[in-house]
Amino acid sequence: MISLYTQATHMKFVYDKATEVEFLKSERILKEKFQAKDTSLSRTAPVRRNIASDIRSFYNDELHIMPIGFLKFIEYYYDLEKIDYVIKEMRRYPKPNKEFLRLLMKGDIEMGGEFPRPYQIDAVVEAVRQRIGGIEVFTGLGKTLIMAILCKVYSESRILILENTIDLVQQTYEKLYKCGLGAELGVIQGANDDDEKRITILCLQSYEKAFNLFPEIQVILADEAHETGRTDTAEKVIYSCQNAPVKFSISATMQTIDNPYESMRLVGNMGPVIYQKNADEGIDEEYLTPTKIEIYQYECEPVPIVGTWSDVYDKIEICPPDKKHTWTQLVEAFEQQNNWAAGLMELFQANMVTNDEECDAALQAFSEIFSKAGYEVTQKGDILLGRKIAYRGDEYTHIVDNKTRNQVIVKIINRYLAQKKRILVLFNRIEHGEILQSMCPGSVLIHGEDDLKARKEAEMYLRENEGVVVFASKIWRKGIDIEQIDNYVNGGGGKSATDAIQKLGRVVRKSRTTEKNIAVVADLDDSCVSPIGRKQSEKRIHVYQDELKLPMEYINI
């Protein structure tokens, strides 16, 4: 008999009483069934040279441990192989508020001025029953209210809510406050470090401020869990909460992660999907706006393929020189750069560095030389970093600087503006947004370098005015709740199913203040650009048509 000892984050397999056959069967299952291809490694040099593998295992065969989220699958495979096992439950679960649950199921609970919908109640009840797992509800179906209800259900527990953007932290705080949880809410993000409240909203970028809090956490809610339930930082936080056996992941796109290893990683950390509500169900039940996809076909000159999506940079890294031989080596390294050699040699001869003050002055001088040579210069600690573009990648040539494609986007926008629509255009790179905005007088541009005030102003601009357009970067790709948006234009293309669904979610919400009766998503068929454009377009069309089952129309423009 195999003993499985379960803890909050992992389970351990003990073979003391197992037969040799049971041991061999178990090890085969754990090694073969719980591994996946990590596509982020597939193009790395060691994998391409067959020195390393892009297959990664979740089973630690030295310690005989595995992430707890796979427990249900272990039981399935053990039962299938008729392996004798016993689960030794070591987790100490916090108790739910049964009286609140009773009133919730009767329909007597009101939160934030609204009564939970039947599917939201069903999701919460299933979550309480399972105590670990994913709630996958489509964007616009009220996942934040589900989180608020769970906070009420576990009314005596310390709860950690994971977010990964400033906007989502702000939005979640406002909604939970509206639901009557304001006095119990604390935020750890940026300058905010309130870790004394029962419920803590943590921006993952500020996780180091919360280390002292992790041992006290009993319940984890991972919002937008396709990211907050599986990244290295998220995993570090989850594994640090060793007293939190109750874990729920919440997102519209937990099962569309393109990387098989990362998809499986989310399950291992947070458990499998235990409740699902799709877009077509939300539309049929009139919780979402009926949505139509418009695919715009156009003609343009084919764009040559470079072979790398991102731009390629020449990079320089210089540590602070504190010895004469360091300066000598530095100059020798740049002797081939004729346009720098004179300046470097002059600097070398004039500055024999003997102390920190001279070192700082030398770094400043180098920074000026790099800038004149066309390098973008930054300083990270004591290291000087310089980079300049060696050549542009396919994203720039296919999307950002594709004049024909950008003109098509503007034509689509003008068509919608003539109908007095509120339009959101999403792009991936700031320079693309700047190009598009320059082609649309009177439009608003928002991106990650803008502060919360500017983002809020852009949000209110869309809410309060008809016949307007806002260009937004990936910061508005998810989680932004502006129900008045009529039309969304996918300006950045892309092949990720997760991104396609998240972006589409910006427009499907029902509007309580406007007469929006249909939401329109505009996307471009980039088949004419190159085989890359064709494959990416086919992937997005597959998501719209086959996964989301939304009506589509092809339009020549």
Predicted regions and their residues:
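Conserved Walker A/P-loop ATP-binding site and its immediately adjacent core
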Residues: 144-149, 153-178, 430
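Inter-Walker segment of RecA-like/P-loop motor cores
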Residues: 178-209
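Post-DEXD/H (motif II) to motif III coupling segment of the RecA-like Helicase ATP-binding lobe
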Residues: 227-292, 544
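A short beta-strand element within the Helicase C-terminal
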Residues: 471, 480-493, 519-523
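Conserved SF2 helicase motif VI
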Residues: 496-517
